[in-house]
Structure formats: C-alpha cells, structure tokens
C-alpha cells in the first residue's frame, strides 16, 4: 500500500515534469535546454556526493531502531542526520558556486551557480523524508514530492520568461542562458516549498514523537559518537552507490562533448544542444516508469530491513519477489509502449519538428533500458535493506567502466554520435541488473520465479504493442481518408487523439492478456497503484471472477 502511494506520487511527479518541460523548451529553445541539462547533470552529481544518500540511510537506521522500540535513539539519528547535512550541504553548495566555471563551460556555469542553494535545501528535505519513510508512512513524502514539482513547474516557466525579458535585445545564445537560469530558480523554489511543508508536518507530529521517547525503556542510549559512526557507515556506501550509479550521466556528458568537439568538429553550442535532446527530452520520458521502481526501492528498504533484523528470511524473500514482480508488470509494457509509440509520444510533448525524428530514435533505444533500470534500482534497495550496502557500489563501478568503454568506442568508430548515449545507457543498466541479481541469489539464497514475473508480462506486452501500433496507424489512415490530415504530415491535435486512443486500448489489451495468461491474481492486482479499481474493472468485463 505504502509503496503504491509513493509509486503513484513518483509517476505523477514525472508526468508533471514532462508536461512542463514542453512549454519550457518552447520558451528557452533547444540551446537553453542544453545549458540547463548540462548544469543539472553536474548539480545532480554534487547533490549525490553531499547529501543524497541521507534519505535511504535515515530510513534504514531509524526503521531498525523503531523495530526494537528504541525511540530515543531514533531521534538521535534524526538530529545527527541534520548536523551531517548542515555541514555536507553547506560545503557542497560553496564548492558548486566557487568552482562552477572550472567544472562546465561558461554558459552552463551561470546556470549551475543558480542551483547552489538548492543543494543545501535538498539535504534537509531528505532527512525529513527518510524519517517519515522509516515510520512506514509514505503519504507525507508523496505529497511533498507532488507539491515540489508543481511549484517547480510554475516557477520555472515564469522565471524563464522573466529572466529572458532582462536580455530581450541580446543575441539568442545569451537569451538561452538566461532562460536556463530561470528554469534553475524553479528547481530551488520547489525544493524549498517541500522542505517547509515537511518541517510543518514534523511540527504537527512532534508531540507524538516526544511521548514515544518519554515512554522508551531502552537501557542504553547511543552516544553522538556512535550516532555519527552509524550515519557515516550507512551513508558512505549509499552515496558511493548512488553517486556511481548516477555518475554515468556526468561521464557521458564529458566523453560525448570531448569526442564530438575534438574529433568531429562540433562547436560547444552544437554539442550542448544535441546532449540536451538526449538528457532533456528523451531521457525524462523513460523516468516515468522508472519512478515506480524508485518508489518501490524506497519503500522496500525499511520493510526488508525490519524483516531481516528479525531474522525472517522467508518473509524477506517474499517481499523481494512481490516487489520484483510488481515492478516488471509496470516496466515491461511501458518499455514496449515507448518503443512502438516513440514518435507520437515525443511529438505530443515536444512538437519541435526539426528534432522530432532524432529524439524519437533516442527514445526507442532508451525504452530497452526501462526494464533494466527498473530492476536494478529495485535490487539496489534490496541489497541495501539486507545489509549488503557495498555490493551496489562495486557493481555500479564495474558497470560504469564497461559503459564508458562502450560509449567511447561507439563515438570514435561508428557514426552513431548522439545515439551512442542511448546504447551506453542500455549497456550500463543491463550490467547493473545482472550483477545485482546474481548477488541477491548468492547472498540471500533467493531465486526469482521466471514465467509469471518475466515471460507472461513480456508476451502480453508484445501483443499489446502490436495492437497499439495498428490502432494508432489505423486512426491516422482514417484522418487522411477524411482529408483532415495530409499523408506524411503531423498535426498535434489529431496526433493526441490517435495516441490517447491507442494507449487506452493498449492498457486494456495488456491487462486482459496478463490476467488470462495467469500472470497476476486478485491479490497482486490490489497491490498495484489503483489496484482495487483495476480489480473492479476486471470483474465487470469478466476477466476475474467475483
């Protein structure tokens, strides 16, 4: 239930992110989008290194203490985590501002400096979110995520327009930089809003937390030395894992820009613009289904940690199996749907026809990584929750090395250029997926069921993909026949109609096939986001017996 809440929120957040990016890119242009994407990539890495491991660390440690009813010690972990992010977040923010010009190009550096305060606020926000997740409640985190993204969307667009008005008489590149800076302001405004909300929620619940601490009969209180040792012990491998896991973006950026500028004659603006198409347009679309796996991972860490601490190996294995199966039920059809309907999806979100085919091509390749990223993200959480926190670090480092080699070879020896980034992303996620799976099997003695988890969803998704393709093309043919659309041309409104109808039919076909082939039962459907609604619909059309 809690995982479903967090997953639904994550998907809503990604959808809002996709929807606001479309008008934003129309305002700041592909060049501005490139500057923003470049700065955002570096901002993300600095955030990961400094404070981004805090939510998972706080969630795991506090959940373990809560299971033992050590409420005073849990509160000490909270206070220790705040001290940690004050120092780490402050240093990271200062580093980001002072060395921005040395890290990225001059234009992107101006955008990166705007992200500086957001790093500090994000650390504080992460502590609150991890603390509430440890209590088994994802509602506060979910609501704050949605609130953060709504404010981000509104302020990003408004600030982009405002900042560009300051330089309306300047050249297009200067306007693009200022528009990207406005977008970065929106990110900070969203994080600050979510932080204030979470602080208010904590204040409302503070009396309850205090009563628990007063009734705590724990004989031994942790010293603050022990508290910081626990935080560092847990945070360090989590940071290393997530940092290396996401370092691929920064590595891709550096390798791509260096090679295409030095060997293929691209200018900085051209390289940045093309990179923005990959990281600012194609990649965010794949983040929608991956958000489900991320939510499952966040939710599963405290629950698996609690079961593992109690020595309940069978309960731990069951939770892992259920999480993997649920993730695959969402990720596999999402990947197939994106591959089949890549061009219409991109055209709805980013109707700039000059780059439409390129972004659609990138998305088709990236669609494959949706399954692998979904599974590897989830299994990262499983390994962290069961105490094997160092394994994802090792796996991520190995995968990063393989990806770097593959990307460099593709850029130097093939004409793939920007498409090499998508191929490298698939390679990275596949390597992580395989290594994490083998480790879980070895360390936990766990073996994933294959037919109902992978094969049936894949067969159902392929059938769904065929139907979706012909429904979309069939409606297009009807519009051409009715002379509402010229053959070979695109119309945004008619494309939306065709796409919506194709997706609706695809969803029905997929779940009908999954249920009929025995891939999911009533209890498993209820565990999905809006699961009870799906069960009622399935009963009405006689796919399930009442």
Where are the regions that the model predicts?
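Helix-loop junctions and terminal segments of transmembrane helices
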Residues: 52-67, 291-312
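Membrane-proximal transmembrane or re-entrant/amphipathic helices at the cytosolic face
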Residues: 474-546
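Interfacial/gating helices of multi-pass transporter permease domains
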Residues: 24-45, 107, 173-181, 229-234, ...
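Membrane-interface helix-loop junctions in multi-pass transport and translocation proteins
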Residues: 139, 150-201, 390, 400-437, ...
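N-terminal membrane topogenesis motif
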Residues: 1-16, 72, 76, 217-245, ...
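Interfacial segments at transmembrane-helix termini and the short loops linking adjacent helices
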Residues: 101-115, 339-370, 484-490
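Alpha-helical transmembrane segments of multi-pass membrane transporters/permeases
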Residues: 6-9, 117, 128-162, 379-408, ...
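Signature of the first transmembrane helix
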Residues: 1-56, 64, 93, 97, ...
């Amino acid at each position: 239930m809690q995982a479903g809440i967090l997953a639904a929120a994550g998907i809503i957040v990604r959808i809002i992110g996709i929807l606001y990016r479309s008008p934003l890119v129309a305002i700041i242009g592909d060049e501005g989008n490139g500057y923003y994407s470049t700065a955002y990539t570096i901002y993300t890495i600095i955030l990961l290194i400094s404070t981004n491991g805090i939510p998972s660390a706080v969630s795991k440690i506090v959940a373990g203490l809560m299971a033992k009813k050590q409420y005073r010690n849990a509160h000490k972990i909270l206070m220790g985590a705040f001290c940690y992010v004050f120092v780490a977040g402050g240093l990271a923010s200062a580093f980001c501002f002072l060395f921005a010009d040395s890290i990225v190009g001059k234009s992107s550096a101006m955008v990166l400096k705007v992200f500086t305060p957001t790093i500090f606020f994000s650390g504080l926000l992460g502590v609150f979110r991890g603390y509430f997740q440890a209590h088994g409640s994802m509602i506060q985190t979910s609501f704050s995520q949605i609130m953060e993204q709504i404010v981000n969307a509104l302020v990003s667009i408004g600030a982009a327009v405002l900042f560009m008005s300051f330089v309306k008489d300047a050249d297009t590149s200067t306007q693009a930089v200022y528009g990207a800076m406005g977008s970065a302001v929106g990110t900070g405004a969203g994080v600050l809003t979510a932080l204030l909300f979470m602080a208010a929620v904590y204040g409302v619940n503070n009396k309850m937390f205090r009563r628990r601490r007063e009734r705590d009969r724990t004989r031994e209180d942790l010293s603050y030395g022990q508290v910081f040792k626990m935080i560092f012990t847990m945070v360090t491998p989590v940071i290393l894992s997530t940092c290396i896991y996401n370092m691929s973006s920064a590595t891709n950026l550096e390798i791509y820009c260096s090679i295409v500028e030095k060997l293929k004659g691209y200018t900085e603006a051209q390289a940045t613009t093309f990179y923005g198409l990959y990281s600012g347009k194609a990649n965010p679309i794949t983040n929608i289904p991956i958000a489900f796996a991320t939510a499952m991972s966040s939710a599963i860490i405290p629950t698996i940690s609690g079961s593992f601490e109690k020595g309940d190996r069978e309960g731990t294995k069951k939770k892992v199996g259920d999480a993997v199966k649920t993730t695959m039920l969402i990720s596999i059809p999402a990947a197939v749907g994106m591959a089949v309907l890549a061009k219409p999806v991109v055209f709805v979100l980013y109707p700039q026809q000059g780059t439409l085919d390129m972004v659609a091509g990138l998305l088709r390749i990236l669609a494959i990584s949706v399954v692998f990223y979904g599974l590897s993200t989830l299994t990262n959480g499983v390994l962290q929750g069961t105490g094997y926190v160092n394994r994802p670090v090792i796996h991520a480092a190995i995968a990063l090395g393989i990806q770097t080699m593959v990307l460099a070879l593709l850029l130097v020896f093939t004409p793939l250029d920007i498409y090499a980034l998508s191929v490298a992303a698939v390679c990275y996620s596949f390597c992580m997926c395989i290594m994490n799976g083998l480790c879980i099997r070895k360390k936990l003695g766990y073996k994933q069921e294959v037919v109902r988890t992978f094969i049936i969803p894949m067969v159902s998704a392929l059938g769904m993909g065929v139907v979706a393709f012909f429904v979309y093309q069939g409606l297009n043919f009807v519009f051409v026949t009715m002379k509402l659309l010229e053959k070979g041309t695109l119309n945004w409104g008619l494309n939306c109609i065709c796409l919506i109808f194709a997706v609706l039919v695809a969803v029905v076909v997929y779940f009908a096939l999954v249920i009929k082939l025995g891939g999911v039962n009533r209890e498993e459907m209820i565990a999905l986001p809006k699961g009870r609604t799906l069960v009622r619909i399935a009963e009405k059309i006689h796919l399930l017996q009442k």
